[in-house]
Amino acid sequence: MQAYTYVEKGKFALLEKPKPVLLHERDAIVKVTLASICSSDLHIKHGSVPRAVPGITVGHEMVGVVESVGSAVTHVKPGDRVTVNVETFCGECFFCKKGFVNN
C-alpha cells in the first residue's frame, strides 16, 4: 500500500509500505479513502515534534472503510464507513507530561 510518509526534516513522500495486519483482538484495519494534512503534520515536517521519526505515516485525520476486525471488536464490522480519531502528542511539553495530550 502507499502512504504519505515523513522522510526527513522538510520532506514528505508517497512511499510503499507493508499492508497492516491484525495483531490484537481489539484491532481494526481501515482502508483510508480520504485523509488531510493539518498543522500537526506541518509541525512534523518542520522538525518540531521530537517523537516523529523518519518513516512515520502522516495524515492522521481520515475517513475510510473497515476491512477487517479482531475478535473483540463489536462496534464496527467490515464494510462500515468510519472516521478515525488518532490523537497525536509530543510527549515533551508540560501538558503531555501531566497526561493531558492533544492540548
Regions inferred by a protein language model and the residue ranges of each:
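Glycine-rich beta-strand-centered segment in the early N-terminal region that forms part
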Residues: 20-35, 48-97, 102
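Short glycine/threonine/proline-enriched tight-turn/helix- or strand-capping micro-motif at secondary-structure
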Residues: 10-19
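Cytochrome P450 core scaffold surrounding the K-helix E-X-X-R motif
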Residues: 40-46
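Extreme N-terminal starter segment of soluble prokaryotic enzymes
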Residues: 1-2
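Short polar catalytic/cofactor-binding loops
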Residues: 9-11, 35-37
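Short hydrophobic/aromatic patches on the structural cores and recognition surfaces of FHA
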Residues: 17, 41, 64
